[in-house]
Amino acid sequence: MKNILFGVRSTVAAALVFGLSHAAFGATDLTVYTAVEAEDLKKYAARFNEDHPDIKINWVRDSTGIVTAKLLAEKENPRADVIWGLAATSLLLMKGEGMLHAYAPSGLDGLDSKFRDKSDPPTWTGMDAWVAAICVNTVESEKHNLPTPSSWEDLTKPVYKGHVAMPNPNSSGTGFLDVSSWLQIFGEDGGWAFMDALHENIGHYTHSGSKPCKQAARGEVAIGVSFAFRGAKSKASGAPLEVIIPSEGIGWDMEATAIVNGTKKLDAAKTLVDWSITEKANKMYNEGYAVIGIQRLAKPVEHFPDNIPQAMIDNDFEWAASNRKRILAEWQKRYDSKSEPKS
């Protein structure tokens, strides 16, 4: 009888322990920092929760530059558990500061080699590539007799004076990939000379990478230097836009994922990072991006220019990350006078 009672008690105790541990894990909240487009956050969390309903994502979202600055400021007292959707150049900077937890997620071998940190184990893994593009409002261009630009150099022609908006690279990852890629395409001296000439035609600099294209879509400017995802999405919504891939080539960066060093929720963080490189996740990224971490899964994206993979420059991410501070300081000194007020 004692054995039976002991067995019952043990079973009940085990069930309680299991229930409590399951409830505790079920209550796991992950603080996830991101620069993913705000409209996609609900979808990303919902798809993840289809497979892992026991982990709740609490998003902290802003533009790439602002999220990067926030993470660096919190280095000694990190508040994020995971970074899901931030520029690889930003993560390389944090890797150098010892801020990322090295982890080889399940399925790593299935990723394109460009979409992972070179360290073993890696500190970050890539999701998709976002690429520079020029968003041209055809109605506004016709109204102002503006020819459709086909190159970056075209944007320096006097005819475009006051009709161009682009992102401030101190706030925007898209702005930084533009600036760092121009310095690679044209060379250091040529890149700054190009930006000096472009600055003459800039109406204003924004603090968001998508905003110049959104403004072009609404007819607030004729031309927005932005990224292809936003142009394609605006065009699909009926905006009178052309998405132009400049002939010199385009800068690009990866949206990438990493675990923040020191998280107290490491198991849940690993679960999210594992999921972020699955085929299911990559198919989700492909709903908006033409180039993804598992490229064999990629299907054409509506209104994306066909020549994007060929136009992507051989971007030196290590160089961009190590020179980021210098580049941003120089840009700020030269051009910040035309930046919009920060909201």
Locations of the language-model features?
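Periplasmic-binding protein-like
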Residues: 110-114, 159-167, 194-199, 205-206, 237-261, 276-298, ...
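Short amphipathic alpha-helical coupling segments at ligand-binding clamshell hinges
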Residues: 44, 190, 194, 255, ...
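Extracytoplasmic ligand-binding site segments that recognize negatively charged/polar headgroups
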Residues: 35-42, 65, 79-220
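An extracytoplasmic/periplasmic, membrane-proximal ligand-sensing/linker region
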Residues: 188-190, 293-343
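A ligand-binding cleft/hinge motif common to bilobed small-molecule-binding domains
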Residues: 89-93, 217, 222-240
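A bilobed periplasmic-binding-protein/Venus flytrap-type ligand-binding module shared by bacterial periplasmic
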Residues: 135-140, 179-183, 253-265, 284-285
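Short, polar/charged alpha-helical segment
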Residues: 31, 35-58, 72
